[in-house]
Amino acid sequence: IHKVFGGKLNLIICGGAALSVQTEEFFENIGMNVINGYGLTETSPLLTANKINDKKIGSAGKVIGGVELKLSKQKEVLARGKNITPGYYKNPSATKKLIQNNWLHTGDIGEFDEDGFLFIRGRVKNMILKQNGMNVYPEDIEKILDKEQLIKESCVIGLNKGTDVIITAALLLSKKASNKEIQKVIDKTNKKLEFHQKIQEFIVWKKKDFPRSFSFKVKKVDVQKTIESKT
Protein backbone atom coordinates (compact mmCIF):
# COMPACT_ATOMS: atom_id res chain seq x y z
CA ILE A 1 0.00 0.00 0.00
CA HIS A 2 2.85 2.39 0.81
CA LYS A 3 4.28 1.81 -2.68
CA VAL A 4 0.99 2.89 -4.26
CA PHE A 5 1.41 6.24 -2.51
CA GLY A 6 5.02 6.60 -3.69
CA GLY A 7 6.70 4.87 -0.77
CA LYS A 8 7.51 8.05 1.17
CA LEU A 9 4.11 9.27 2.34
CA ASN A 10 3.74 9.08 6.12
CA LEU A 11 1.55 12.09 6.94
CA ILE A 12 -1.96 12.90 5.70
CA ILE A 13 -3.58 16.22 6.60
CA CYS A 14 -7.33 15.99 6.17
CA GLY A 15 -10.09 18.60 6.01
CA GLY A 16 -13.30 19.32 4.15
CA ALA A 17 -15.98 16.64 4.46
CA ALA A 18 -15.99 14.53 7.61
CA LEU A 19 -13.50 11.66 7.59
CA SER A 20 -14.97 8.33 8.65
CA VAL A 21 -13.41 6.67 11.69
CA GLN A 22 -13.02 3.48 9.65
CA THR A 23 -10.92 5.26 7.01
CA GLU A 24 -8.82 7.06 9.61
CA GLU A 25 -8.14 3.84 11.51
CA PHE A 26 -7.16 2.06 8.28
CA PHE A 27 -4.42 4.57 7.45
CA GLU A 28 -3.25 4.75 11.06
CA ASN A 29 -2.97 0.95 11.19
CA ILE A 30 -0.68 0.85 8.15
CA GLY A 31 1.65 3.40 9.69
CA MET A 32 0.45 6.69 8.25
CA ASN A 33 -0.25 9.64 10.53
CA VAL A 34 -3.64 11.21 9.85
CA ILE A 35 -4.11 14.78 11.07
CA ASN A 36 -7.73 15.88 11.00
CA GLY A 37 -8.81 19.50 11.30
CA TYR A 38 -11.96 21.60 11.09
CA GLY A 39 -12.88 25.05 9.89
CA LEU A 40 -14.73 27.11 7.31
CA THR A 41 -13.78 29.40 4.46
CA GLU A 42 -15.16 32.18 6.66
CA THR A 43 -12.64 31.30 9.40
CA SER A 44 -9.52 31.53 7.22
CA PRO A 45 -10.02 28.46 7.35
CA LEU A 46 -8.92 26.65 10.53
CA LEU A 47 -10.64 26.48 13.93
CA THR A 48 -9.44 23.19 15.41
CA ALA A 49 -6.77 20.64 14.61
CA ASN A 50 -5.23 17.43 15.87
CA LYS A 51 -1.47 17.17 16.34
CA ILE A 52 0.80 14.21 15.66
CA ASN A 53 1.44 13.71 19.38
CA ASP A 54 -1.93 14.94 20.62
CA LYS A 55 -4.88 13.56 18.70
CA LYS A 56 -7.99 11.43 18.95
CA ILE A 57 -9.36 9.37 16.08
CA GLY A 58 -12.78 10.63 15.03
CA SER A 59 -12.24 14.10 16.43
CA ALA A 60 -11.59 17.44 14.75
CA GLY A 61 -8.86 18.18 17.29
CA LYS A 62 -8.47 21.01 19.80
CA VAL A 63 -9.07 24.73 19.37
CA ILE A 64 -6.08 26.47 17.77
CA GLY A 65 -4.42 29.56 19.24
CA GLY A 66 -6.21 32.87 18.81
CA VAL A 67 -9.61 31.22 18.40
CA GLU A 68 -12.49 30.96 20.86
CA LEU A 69 -15.19 28.32 20.47
CA LYS A 70 -18.36 27.66 22.42
CA LEU A 71 -21.55 25.67 21.92
CA SER A 72 -25.02 27.17 21.76
CA LYS A 73 -28.02 25.59 23.49
CA GLN A 74 -28.56 23.60 20.28
CA LYS A 75 -24.90 22.55 20.45
CA GLU A 76 -24.06 24.61 17.38
CA VAL A 77 -20.36 25.47 17.19
CA LEU A 78 -19.86 29.23 17.56
CA ALA A 79 -16.51 30.89 16.86
CA ARG A 80 -14.73 34.20 17.24
CA GLY A 81 -11.19 35.44 16.72
CA LYS A 82 -9.03 37.57 14.46
CA ASN A 83 -9.25 34.94 11.71
CA ILE A 84 -13.04 35.34 11.42
CA THR A 85 -14.44 37.14 8.38
CA PRO A 86 -16.06 40.54 9.05
CA GLY A 87 -18.90 39.47 6.76
CA TYR A 88 -19.99 38.83 3.20
CA TYR A 89 -19.20 41.47 0.58
CA LYS A 90 -22.21 43.71 -0.06
CA ASN A 91 -24.54 41.18 1.59
CA PRO A 92 -25.57 42.53 5.00
CA SER A 93 -28.52 40.15 5.38
CA ALA A 94 -26.31 37.06 4.98
CA THR A 95 -23.72 38.61 7.30
CA LYS A 96 -26.39 39.21 9.96
CA LYS A 97 -27.34 35.52 9.88
CA LEU A 98 -23.70 34.40 9.98
CA ILE A 99 -22.43 36.65 12.78
CA GLN A 100 -24.60 37.32 15.83
CA ASN A 101 -23.36 39.10 18.97
CA ASN A 102 -19.79 38.88 17.60
CA TRP A 103 -19.98 35.07 17.30
CA LEU A 104 -19.84 33.31 13.94
CA HIS A 105 -22.48 30.60 13.62
CA THR A 106 -20.88 27.66 11.81
CA GLY A 107 -24.08 25.68 11.24
CA ASP A 108 -22.31 22.60 12.60
CA ILE A 109 -23.35 20.66 15.69
CA GLY A 110 -20.48 19.63 17.93
CA GLU A 111 -19.45 18.22 21.29
CA PHE A 112 -16.29 18.65 23.35
CA ASP A 113 -14.93 15.71 25.33
CA GLU A 114 -13.27 15.98 28.73
CA ASP A 115 -9.87 16.56 27.08
CA GLY A 116 -11.03 19.44 24.90
CA PHE A 117 -11.29 17.55 21.60
CA LEU A 118 -14.11 18.65 19.31
CA PHE A 119 -16.34 16.07 17.66
CA ILE A 120 -18.62 17.23 14.84
CA ARG A 121 -22.01 15.52 15.00
CA GLY A 122 -23.84 17.00 12.03
CA ARG A 123 -25.52 20.10 10.64
CA VAL A 124 -28.04 22.26 12.47
CA LYS A 125 -30.28 22.37 9.40
CA ASN A 126 -30.37 18.55 9.27
CA MET A 127 -31.21 18.02 12.95
CA ILE A 128 -34.54 16.32 13.63
CA LEU A 129 -36.47 17.50 16.68
CA LYS A 130 -38.78 14.83 18.10
CA GLN A 131 -42.05 15.76 19.80
CA ASN A 132 -40.58 14.74 23.16
CA GLY A 133 -37.83 17.35 22.74
CA MET A 134 -35.08 14.86 21.86
CA ASN A 135 -32.64 15.84 19.11
CA VAL A 136 -31.77 13.30 16.43
CA TYR A 137 -28.71 13.79 14.24
CA PRO A 138 -29.26 12.01 10.87
CA GLU A 139 -25.52 11.67 10.31
CA ASP A 140 -25.23 9.33 13.33
CA ILE A 141 -27.75 6.96 11.75
CA GLU A 142 -26.45 7.27 8.19
CA LYS A 143 -22.91 6.33 9.23
CA ILE A 144 -24.19 2.98 10.51
CA LEU A 145 -26.54 2.30 7.60
CA ASP A 146 -23.93 3.11 4.96
CA LYS A 147 -21.62 0.39 6.29
CA GLU A 148 -24.14 -2.28 5.27
CA GLN A 149 -23.39 -4.02 1.96
CA LEU A 150 -27.00 -3.76 0.86
CA ILE A 151 -27.01 0.03 1.28
CA LYS A 152 -25.27 2.15 -1.34
CA GLU A 153 -26.19 5.34 0.49
CA SER A 154 -28.82 6.49 2.96
CA CYS A 155 -30.59 9.75 3.67
CA VAL A 156 -32.33 10.03 7.04
CA ILE A 157 -35.08 12.61 7.49
CA GLY A 158 -37.94 13.37 9.88
CA LEU A 159 -41.51 13.17 8.56
CA ASN A 160 -44.33 14.86 10.44
CA LYS A 161 -47.10 12.33 10.95
CA GLY A 162 -49.88 13.01 13.40
CA THR A 163 -48.45 14.14 16.71
CA ASP A 164 -44.90 12.89 16.17
CA VAL A 165 -41.93 13.15 13.85
CA ILE A 166 -41.14 9.79 12.25
CA ILE A 167 -37.48 8.90 11.69
CA THR A 168 -37.43 7.79 8.06
CA ALA A 169 -34.55 6.31 6.08
CA ALA A 170 -34.52 6.82 2.32
CA LEU A 171 -32.29 4.11 0.89
CA LEU A 172 -30.27 3.77 -2.30
CA LEU A 173 -29.69 0.04 -2.63
CA SER A 174 -26.53 -1.56 -4.01
CA LYS A 175 -28.65 -4.42 -5.37
CA LYS A 176 -32.27 -5.55 -5.53
CA ALA A 177 -33.65 -6.76 -2.22
CA SER A 178 -36.96 -7.72 -0.68
CA ASN A 179 -38.59 -5.66 2.05
CA LYS A 180 -37.81 -8.50 4.43
CA GLU A 181 -34.09 -8.30 3.64
CA ILE A 182 -34.11 -4.53 4.03
CA GLN A 183 -35.98 -4.76 7.33
CA LYS A 184 -33.24 -7.05 8.66
CA VAL A 185 -30.71 -4.28 7.94
CA ILE A 186 -32.96 -1.74 9.66
CA ASP A 187 -33.37 -3.99 12.71
CA LYS A 188 -29.61 -4.55 12.88
CA THR A 189 -29.00 -0.80 12.69
CA ASN A 190 -31.62 0.00 15.32
CA LYS A 191 -29.87 -2.27 17.81
CA LYS A 192 -26.91 0.12 17.66
CA LEU A 193 -29.01 3.25 18.20
CA GLU A 194 -30.57 4.96 21.20
CA PHE A 195 -34.35 4.66 21.55
CA HIS A 196 -35.07 8.16 20.20
CA GLN A 197 -32.78 7.54 17.19
CA LYS A 198 -34.37 4.32 15.97
CA ILE A 199 -35.54 4.17 12.35
CA GLN A 200 -39.32 3.93 12.28
CA GLU A 201 -39.82 3.44 8.57
CA PHE A 202 -37.78 3.08 5.39
CA ILE A 203 -38.36 4.00 1.77
CA VAL A 204 -36.42 2.59 -1.18
CA TRP A 205 -35.28 5.44 -3.42
CA LYS A 206 -36.25 4.35 -6.94
CA LYS A 207 -34.13 6.82 -8.89
CA LYS A 208 -30.47 6.20 -9.74
CA ASP A 209 -29.26 8.77 -7.24
CA PHE A 210 -30.38 11.27 -4.64
CA PRO A 211 -30.68 14.92 -5.71
CA ARG A 212 -27.33 16.58 -5.04
CA SER A 213 -25.77 20.01 -4.74
CA PHE A 214 -22.83 21.22 -6.82
CA SER A 215 -20.56 19.85 -4.07
CA PHE A 216 -22.28 16.43 -4.40
CA LYS A 217 -23.98 16.63 -1.01
CA VAL A 218 -27.44 15.07 -0.79
CA LYS A 219 -30.21 17.66 -0.89
CA LYS A 220 -32.20 16.44 2.09
CA VAL A 221 -34.92 19.05 1.60
CA ASP A 222 -35.55 17.78 -1.94
CA VAL A 223 -35.57 14.17 -0.75
CA GLN A 224 -38.11 15.07 1.92
CA LYS A 225 -40.33 16.99 -0.51
CA THR A 226 -40.33 14.05 -2.93
CA ILE A 227 -41.31 11.58 -0.21
CA GLU A 228 -43.97 13.87 1.27
CA SER A 229 -45.54 14.39 -2.16
CA LYS A 230 -46.09 10.64 -2.45
CA THR A 231 -47.52 10.05 1.04
Report residues per predicted region:
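AMP-binding/adenylate-forming catalytic core of the ANL superfamily
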Residues: 71, 81, 87, 109-195
